[in-house]
Amino acid sequence: MTMNAIVVATSLLSASLAATPALAAQTSPLINTAAGGAPTSQRQVITSSEQLPRRVVKLDKLPSQYLEAPRAEVLALADTLEKNLRDDLARFDIQDAATMRGYIGSLLTLAQYKGDWAAVPGLVAQLKALQDKPGPRATTGTMATIVAEQQTGKRDAAWVQDEVRKRYSAMNWTDVADGVKSFKGQMELLNPALVKGSFEQQIDVMARNMQMSVPEAIVGTIVGARLQNELVVPLKAAVVNGLQAVIDAREKAGNATKRDIWTPRLFTIAPNARASEVGVGIWDSGVDLALFKPTAGRGIAFDREVRPSKDLLRPLGDSQANWPQLKTLLKGAMDLQAALDTEDARRLKQAVATLKPEQVKQFQEELGLAGLYTHGTHVAGIAVEGNPFARVYTATMLWEHRSEPVKPTEELSRRTAEAYKQIVQSFKDQKLRVVNMSWRYGASAYEGMLAWHNVGANPEERKQLARQLFAIERDALRQAIASAPEILFVAGSGNEDNSADFEEYIPAGFNLPNLLTVGAVDKAGEETSFSTFGKTVVLHANGFEVESLLPGGDRVKFSGTSMASPQVANLAAKLFALKPELTVAQVREVILKGAERQGRVNLIHPRKSAELLGLRL
């Protein structure tokens, strides 16, 4: 199963393919119902994404050809999509805010493309009402509103730049700083060639495989790309300059940096402390064990088809020669997200700006490969930071990085299930105390993979097959974790700002006594805009711009719940090292007891948890 690797370069590039993130939401959020919809009591209650309908749309031409097709052809697709979305809202009482944000955000994109500017304020208001994080609530719909006013008032780019500066300057900087900087980075990477190349080399391939009957979401992607190319790209410089003016003014005023409440909570174990070695498992995409003290067994690995492999660190293959450049691009992406004008950031912008459509697939796949190559080592560095007694064991999954997914089959899922059992057994054999899992997936991932390969007679059949395959792996993973009560497993919740419960993520959605699921905050202790939530998300830790190791030893900052969960694994490993007699239940209890609750956030406090055990730091 593929992993949602936390590689900001990839996410920044992908943002340019989303349904106009610059216009719709930048982040999107319960609306009452579609106009004319049935009363709530008469609508079907939806508590899981599995309950929602799946649809396909028959295209008359390749998706890429719609990028330059007559507007009337795209409007016909948009009308069909809008009718289906409004029918769903009339029929279903959807209990998940993130899913509702998707619906309303799509309607907003459609309204903008159709030029229905009068509908924009109401849709923006509905999105804001669905957003429970202060930063996204403040920024949601800002650009959609500006563009609507620009279009109706026939304003020029200079007006847009000034409005961007004024409206973002009026926001609470503590709430919106990270989002504004990230949004500026997304805008700087806008490139129509990137969109065209992604369509031609990836989306068109899927459409051909599916004999032109594509998932309905592809229509939204087409409309979003047209809207982006026609309305957003011409305003790129104005928006970037306006946002930069806001950032510059905040830095000049001295309030550009948030207060750091995270670092003072941390503690380090001295090399001469009275402590015992503790085995820490990193179940991930591979670890450069040369950077760490490994356990005796070192690790176990499985390839893209879940067959045993000897590669504990993912090979770069033909991309090895490009590693220095890829490393620069990864660093540049992080600098761009932080709105830093560095040489690495400039190189990334130059690389994206000069991309030709035929180069996009290789470029994106190499970045994806680099992400998987670096992810596990970065996670491991966080998990053992400040703990000289930690010994690392890697469980390496060589997930697919190419755009063409592995074809899901029952045989593959049963091999995956068996691999999960073997991996956990290896943890037991190595007597590990803590295992970090910075990955998750749900049944919907298999639906997309099955669709790519045109497996299943229709979307509903694909949905059922996906759930059957997913259930094989879900049950095996749950049983494997439950079979090791002496090991504390720690999982990242996800980076989709959605409900792990609604999406049925594993392992994040498991409720087991030896598992902790972790969401992400920044150094100020504020929930990040991307962090997934849910009933099983019981702890939070810093997952924003966390510095750690890359293979080879360089250090870089990554963001994601992938960076938050190893912070909890780090604390657990330190407690086990200092008091090896502790049980999983005791460590779990003291971590939870030491955490500080503020609304939905339950932020760990490593020092407090240690002190609750009587440890003198």
Which ranges hold each PLM region?
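Subtilisin-like peptidase catalytic core
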Residues: 63-70, 112, 159, 163, ...
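Helix-turn-helix repeat elements of alpha-solenoid scaffolds
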Residues: 71-87
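Residue at a conserved register position within TPR or TPR-like alpha-solenoid repeats
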Residues: 104, 111-114
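N-terminal domain-start motif of subtilase-like serine proteases
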Residues: 149-164, 248-282, 287-296, 362-372, ...
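Hydrolase catalytic cores
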Residues: 177-209, 397, 543-607
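Subtilisin-like serine protease catalytic core
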Residues: 265-415, 430, 512-514, 524-526, ...
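Substrate-binding/access-modulating region of protease and related hydrolase catalytic domains
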Residues: 366, 400-506, 554-559, 563-565
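Extracellular S/T/G-rich loop segment that most often corresponds to the catalytic His/Ser-adjacent loop
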Residues: 486, 492, 500-577, 581
